């Protein structure tokens, strides 16, 4: 199974900076298997970057509309159908920043996941507990509740990103045992919904303060790859992470 690196740029880079960054990565193409890397860039850049870099890279939207219609009077919204028209094959859904800052709830996230699936876009669904749930030992129940709202997607091609909210951007990383415990539970819950005659195509990645310094250890936690934020904005750390992940295959 190919290991995955999702590079989430968030609201960083001008368009020219984005092009320069990807050009630098292109210069390393002989040493990096780019097919395993998904760049989640600002939605505004998707069309231009895909035009400039053609099929060199996989690109992901950082969000997608919850509106089921492909078009309509919805100011500011970008439908899954619009993304698919650009040949965008991935979209991040339910990132903790959107849950917190934009009050996205389980129904909103489920709608976005369903819209992605209906348009042959692979949703990268972010789940994870706040520090309160970790401290009071209810984190497994918290995560299970998040998963219950998207259980309809478990027979589809999706990526689940486990990102403890308290770990994102904090330099605090769960222990390997902690990550493995959650990953194991996720797989157990998935298996309840997947018939025996259907192959499990769900991949699980870890996100939350992933860096070049801890990637080797994180990869021992039974995951299929990583979702990285800040560390993916610097070429040296990103290439180190990619090379390390490649070593698994």
Swiss-Prot record:
GO terms for cellular component: cytosol. Substrate binds at residues 8-10, 169, 209. SUPFAM superfamilies: Triosephosphate isomerase (TIM) (SSF51351). It catalyses: D-glyceraldehyde 3-phosphate = dihydroxyacetone phosphate. Homodimer. It is found in: Cytoplasm. GO terms for molecular function: triose-phosphate isomerase activity. One of its GO terms (biological process) is glycerol catabolic process. The gene is tpiA. Involved in the gluconeogenesis. Catalyzes stereospecifically the conversion of dihydroxyacetone phosphate (DHAP) to D-glyceraldehyde-3-phosphate (G3P). Its EC number is 5.3.1.1. It holds the Pfam family TIM. The active site is at 95 (electrophile), 163 (proton acceptor). The lineage of its organism: Bacteria, Pseudomonadati, Pseudomonadota, Alphaproteobacteria, Rickettsiales. Pathway: Carbohydrate biosynthesis; gluconeogenesis; Carbohydrate degradation; glycolysis; D-glyceraldehyde 3-phosphate from glycerone phosphate: step 1/1. This is Triosephosphate isomerase. It comes from the Bacteria. Keywords: Cytoplasm, Gluconeogenesis, Glycolysis, Isomerase.
């Amino acid at each position: 199974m190919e290991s995955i690196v999702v590079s989430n740029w968030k609201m960083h880079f001008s368009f020219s900076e984005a092009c320069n960054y990807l050009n630098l990565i292109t210069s390393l193409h002989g040493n990096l298997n780019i097919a395993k890397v998904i760049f989640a860039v600002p939605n505004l850049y998707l069309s231009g970057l895909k035009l400039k870099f053609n099929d060199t890279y996989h690109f992901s939207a950082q969000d997608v509309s919850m509106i089921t219609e492909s078009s309509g009077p919805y100011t500011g919204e970008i439908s899954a159908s619009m993304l698919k028209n650009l040949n965008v094959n991935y979209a991040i859904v339910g990132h903790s920043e959107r849950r917190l800052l934009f009050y996205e709830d389980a129904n909103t996230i489920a709608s976005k996941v369903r819209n992605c699936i209906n348009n042959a876009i692979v949703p990268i669904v972010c789940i994870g507990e706040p520090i309160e749930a970790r401290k009071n030992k209810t984190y497994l129940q918290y995560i299970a509740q998040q998963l219950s709202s998207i259980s309809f997607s478990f027979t589809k091609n999706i990526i689940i990103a486990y990102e403890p909210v308290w770990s994102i951007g904090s330099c605090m990383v769960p222990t390997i045992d902690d990550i493995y415990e959650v990953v194991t539970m996720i797989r157990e819950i998935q298996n309840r919904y997947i018939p025996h005659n259907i192959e499990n195509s769900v991949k699980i990645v870890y996100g939350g303060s992933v860096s070049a310094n801890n990637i080797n250890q994180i990869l021992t936690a039974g995951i299929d790859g990583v979702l990285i934020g800040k560390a993916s904005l610097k070429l040296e750390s990103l290439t180190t992470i990619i090379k390390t992940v490649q070593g698994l295959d």
